[in-house]
From Swiss-Prot:
<dbReference type="InterPro" id="IPR001233">
    <property type="entry name" value="RtcB"/>
</dbReference>
<comment type="similarity">
    <text>Belongs to the RtcB family.</text>
</comment>
<dbReference type="GO" id="GO:0072669">
    <property type="term" value="C:tRNA-splicing ligase complex"/>
</dbReference>
<dbReference type="GO" id="GO:0005525">
    <property type="term" value="F:GTP binding"/>
</dbReference>
<feature type="binding site">
    <location>
        <position position="249"/>
    </location>
    <ligand>
        <name>Mn(2+) 1</name>
    </ligand>
</feature>
<dbReference type="GO" id="GO:0006388">
    <property type="term" value="P:tRNA splicing, via endonucleolytic cleavage and ligation"/>
</dbReference>
<feature type="binding site">
    <location>
        <position position="428"/>
    </location>
    <ligand>
        <name>GMP</name>
    </ligand>
</feature>
<keyword id="KW-0819">tRNA processing</keyword>
<feature type="binding site">
    <location>
        <position position="141"/>
    </location>
    <ligand>
        <name>Mn(2+) 1</name>
    </ligand>
</feature>
<dbReference type="GO" id="GO:0046872">
    <property type="term" value="F:metal ion binding"/>
</dbReference>
<feature type="binding site">
    <location>
        <begin position="447"/>
        <end position="450"/>
    </location>
    <ligand>
        <name>GMP</name>
    </ligand>
</feature>
<dbReference type="GO" id="GO:0170057">
    <property type="term" value="F:RNA ligase (GTP) activity"/>
</dbReference>
<keyword id="KW-0342">GTP-binding</keyword>
<keyword id="KW-0464">Manganese</keyword>
<feature type="binding site">
    <location>
        <position position="281"/>
    </location>
    <ligand>
        <name>Mn(2+) 2</name>
    </ligand>
</feature>
<dbReference type="InterPro" id="IPR027513">
    <property type="entry name" value="RtcB_euk"/>
</dbReference>
<feature type="binding site">
    <location>
        <position position="523"/>
    </location>
    <ligand>
        <name>GMP</name>
    </ligand>
</feature>
Length: 524
């Protein structure tokens, strides 16, 4: 199983196509000579200096170790004029030109995306009336996020039931492109869900009241307005509540494989190696995608198009259109909270069916639920002064420091949990936020492994059959709606998640608490 790319030390990579630019060696990699004066390598990051892109308001920073740095330089070297997306380095610099920006950052898992890189973080100061909110800085899957449930089961308890459990989960939780649930929501229910989020499920007896405590924003963002969500978006979400979707979304049954911080793990109810957990990764489905598309279209048609990159076109946050997008985005985010909550309901019911014990008896408590595609109003210290900001996190996880008032009381001594999913067949991690992260990254860390090669290139270079076979060899029960697409999510298509989380720890923006390995993977 090969992507055609093998990481190596100090490797000089040749361009895919001839580029008529003079090249220069930069820390063992070749880059266009014109870029070199504006790049600085530290032991944990790449600094992109003002001037790399005309109009940059300040330096930008990308957290990376040596191997991840190589990938960034390779992408910069090979970027082509007229391509759909610029290189991740250029996108991070582009964001530093936006009105009101305090700093543009990229996490170690960053890769090119629409407007912002996926893994991009940027805070805009709200004392600047021109500070923008940018749909391309949130992404199309609004409030894509991850939640982790724990159990009191061990791997030895679950091993005899792996195939049965995998089949039942695939049956009970629809996944794949355009999949629908058995329930079609009424207009009234849609409005309630987009307003109340996870609270709606609690009222219906489909989620536990304590789930609200262990969910970012308590599972409901107050400043939302469902009436700003178009009928087209509503139509796409009406029958998708409780569905996984496709792409990198998944449901995994995992075992705790290693505990690095026993005290922090204990606070989360994780006590020993072999303990079984459930990880759910999904977002707002077609509804969120359409909300983003509607407001991208609005921004481009009604605003001055961004001269650096049209994909970065946004609107002033405090303008009427800025507030409309923000409130519609929050409505979609509430739908995503409810979606993950509904999937959790089906997971709890499935475990009860297979193990003949109630979810309460199985200790199926929510450890935490995090967002990683969202923009939020927050306050951060900037040059010693507390500044109100709108913080964009696109493929990045909020990871606030210990004692922060917005995190649950149980986690105040350790910091906000940040759940980091690895590529299919590899490990995942639980991190917590740090005080240093509040200073360096607006309380943000990575969100996953991050793509190394595109889906198209993965399908060209990796055999889906070999991916499925490799999962079998690892003893992982894989349930995938379309096995022909398995190559898109192959391990070789992604960066090494271990390198990503260790880079975050080395940079001081988060700490590793424990590692999980998959036993069952359910994908679209």
């Amino acid at each position: 199983m090969s992507s055609g790319y093998k990481p190596g030390k100090k490797r000089i990579i040749q361009p895919i196509q001839p580029i008529k630019k003079e090249l220069i060696d930069f820390h063992g990699c070749q880059i266009p000579k014109e870029c070199e004066p504006y790049l600085e390598r530290t032991n944990v990051s790449l600094i992109i200096k003002k001037g790399f892109i005309n109009g940059m308001k300040n330096d930008a920073e990308m957290f990376c170790n040596e191997d991840l740095f190589e990938l960034l330089m390779n992408e910069l070297l090979n970027e082509q004029p007229g391509a759909s997306f610029s290189s991740c380095v250029r996108q991070t610099a582009n964001v530093a030109t936006l009105p009101g920006v305090i700093k543009s950052l990229a996490m170690p898992d960053a890769h090119s995306g629409y407007g912002f890189s996926i893994g991009g973080v940027a805070a805009m100061r709200l004392d600047d009336p021109n500070a923008v909110i940018c749909p391309g800085g949130v992404g199309f899957d609004i409030n894509c996020g991850v939640r982790l449930l724990r159990t009191n089961l061990d791997d030895k308890d679950i091993e005899p039931h792996l195939a049965e459990l995998a089949d039942a989960l695939q049956k009970n939780i629809p996944s794949g492109v355009g999949t629908t649930s058995t329930q079609t929501l009424t207009e009234k229910e849609m409005n309630e869900i987009m307003n109340e989020g996870l609270e709606w499920l609690v009222k219906k007896g489909l989620a536990w009241k304590e789930d609200l405590v262990y969910c970012e924003e308590n599972g409901r963002i107050i400043n939302s307005d469902p009436h700003l969500v178009s009928q087209k978006a509503r139509g796409r979400g009406r029958n998708q509540l409780g569905t996984l979707g496709s792409g990198n979304h998944y449901l995994e049954i995992q075992r705790v494989d290693e505990i690095m911080d026993k005290e922090a793990a204990k606070q989360m109810g994780i006590s020993h190696i072999g303990q079984i957990c459930i990880m759910i990764h999904c977002g707002s489905r077609g509804l969120g995608h359409q909300v983003c598309q509607d407001f991208v279209d609005m921004c481009v048609s009604q605003s001055n198009k961004n001269e650096v990159d049209i994909q970065l076109t946004g609107v002033p946050f405090q303008s009427d259109n800025g507030q409309k997008y923000f409130k519609a985005m929050n409505a979609a985010a509430n739908y995503a909270f409810a979606n993950r909550g509904m999937i959790s309901y089906h997971v709890r019911c499935t475990f009860e069916q297979v193990f003949q014990k109630s979810p309460k008896d199985l200790d199926m408590h929510l450890v935490y639920d995090v967002c990683h595609n969202i923009a939020k109003e927050e306050s951060h210290l900037v040059d010693g002064k507390e500044i109100k900001c709108i913080v964009h996190r696109k493929g990045a996880t909020r990871a606030f420091a210990p004692l922060n008032p917005v995190i649950p009381d149980a986690y105040k001594p350790i910091g906000q949990p940040a759940i980091i999913g690895g590529s299919m067949g590899t490990c995942s991690y639980m991190l917590v936020g740090t005080q240093e992260g509040m200073k360096k990254s607006f309380g943000s860390t990575c969100h996953g492994a991050g793509r190394k090669i595109s889906r198209v290139n993965a399908m060209k270079n990796i055999s889906s059959d070999s991916v499925v076979e490799e999962m079998k060899k690892k003893g992982i029960e894989l349930r995938i709606t379309d096995p022909k697409l398995a190559a898109e999510e192959a391990d070789d298509a992604y960066k090494d998640v271990k390198e990503v989380v260790e880079t975050c720890q080395s940079a001081g923006i988060s700490r590793i608490v424990f590692k999980l390995k998959p036993l069952i993977v359910v994908k679209g």
